[in-house]
Amino acid sequence: MRYHPHTPDDVRAMLDVVGAERVDDLFRSIPQALRLDRPLDLPPAADEIALFSELRRLAARNETAHPPFVGAGCYPHHVPPVVDQLLLRGEFFTAYTPYQPEISQGTLQVLFEWQTFVCLLTGMDVSNASMYDGATATAEAALMAGRITGRDKVVVSAALHPEYRKVLATYLRSTGDEIVTVPFGADGRTDLAALAQAVDGRTACVILGYPNFLGVVDALPEAAAIARAAGALTVSATAEAVSLGLLQAPGALGADVAVGTFQSFGNPMSFGGPAPGFFATREKSLRQMPGRVAGATVDKQGRRGFVLTLSTREQHIRREKATSNICTNSGLCALASTIHLSLLGKRGLAELARLNHGRARMLRDAMERAGCRPVLSGPYFNEQVFDVGDAEAVVAKLAKRGIVAGAPLARWYPDAPHAKGALLCAATELHGPELIQLFASTVRS
């Protein structure tokens, strides 16, 4: 049975409304020479069995290697099957904004719980209902700092994720704000002397990775003290959120804003995304926070309910009063993270974080035995840089053996010491002792 979405009467009614005689009139602005006047060259329709067979054939062309030893902002972690199962529920399976609270209580409650998790892990007072990703959350933090301080300069650590820095530059291009990048030292941490010299009375905020792109746990308390002395805000950006189960919360170390992504919770790597961004800050900055907030309230019958509140985005209020124009965001990804964190619990998250750090130590020992020394001396979580001689060559050779080796740092830091041999490698709970030993011995060979 064929399905015809529009009957001739339907088409006639729509044409009458728009004042057109024929459907072709709607395309009058397109020159005749550019119009296709023949049927599309498509293969005949396939039945379901043939279609799945063709899709499997195409999928088999992909080269897969799981788990990879590459992190660089997107990390391989185990996702419990129940996460995907709950995501498929009809009440949840959308990323769209829950504008009607009376029919969106489930989604709103999940976003409320998401905000709770974000605040618990970051040590902040308030969180919004998620951002697009970690990079845009970082850029929005810089914009918020400018609104709060009235200043037009942002100081960024060179060890912040390079793609976060690129997105930040894109956002600030339209505002005219100045971006000053300060180097990192031999330990992989931000150079505090250079930071102190760069921060002045024009500085709106200082932005550091925590941990940073090099896998190093940066000097957040010291950087926050420098920023505070100049009246600037401190922004911590976390791409590997599992680290927050082991490290001190950014808020406890002096950060005024904590941003990043929860990709590590409930979201597969999926070629780099999508992944939910998070944004948390102090209560005094609540009305300058971008996005929207899910809040708990009571209806006229006295029953607890959830609504969107303090939605200071331009779709809700006047553009000149809005703090952002974030629209339909990563709500479904945020739901996945919320489910995963609920399953882990406080103790489970701490155990997962310790396991990740333990696997990173195991990788470090194995690589040192293989003659590949660590490049940086700073403290690390589950990611670190090794000197493998020729990083690009090692990556290419290991790819032929079905191993994704890591990220050559020279792609982003061509002038850094040991740049040619520097390979950024991550180890998570998915990398068992045998796999780590295989990786190290293969690199050595």
From Swiss-Prot:
List the Gene Ontology MF annotations in alphabetical order: glycine dehydrogenase (decarboxylating) activity
The record's annotation in SUPFAM superfamilies points to: PLP-dependent transferases (SSF53383)
**One Pfam match:** GDC-P
Task: Provide the GO biological process annotations.
Answer: glycine decarboxylation via glycine cleavage system; nucleoside metabolic process
Q: Does the record carry Ribosomal protein as a key word?
A: no
Supply the CDD domains for this chain. Answer: GDC-P
EC number of this enzyme: 1.4.4.2
The leader peptide range reads none
What catalytic activity does the UniProt entry give for this protein? N(6)-[(R)-lipoyl]-L-lysyl-[glycine-cleavage complex H protein] + glycine + H(+) = N(6)-[(R)-S(8)-aminomethyldihydrolipoyl]-L-lysyl-[glycine-cleavage complex H protein] + CO2
Q: Does the keyword Oxidoreductase apply?
A: yes
Keywords associated with the record: Oxidoreductase
Superkingdom: Bacteria
**Which InterPro entries does the record associate with it?**
GcvPA (IPR023010), GDC-P_N (IPR049315), GDC_P (IPR020581), PyrdxlP-dep_Trfase (IPR015424), PyrdxlP-dep_Trfase_major (IPR015421), PyrdxlP-dep_Trfase_small (IPR015422)
User: What does the record note on quaternary structure?
Assistant: The glycine cleavage system is composed of four proteins: P, T, L and H. In this organism, the P 'protein' is a heterodimer of two subunits.
Family membership: Belongs to the GcvP family. N-terminal subunit subfamily.
Q: Report the protein's function.
A: The glycine cleavage system catalyzes the degradation of glycine. The P protein binds the alpha-amino group of glycine through its pyridoxal phosphate cofactor; CO(2) is released and the remaining methylamine moiety is then transferred to the lipoamide cofactor of the H protein.
Name of the featured protein: Probable glycine dehydrogenase (decarboxylating) subunit 1
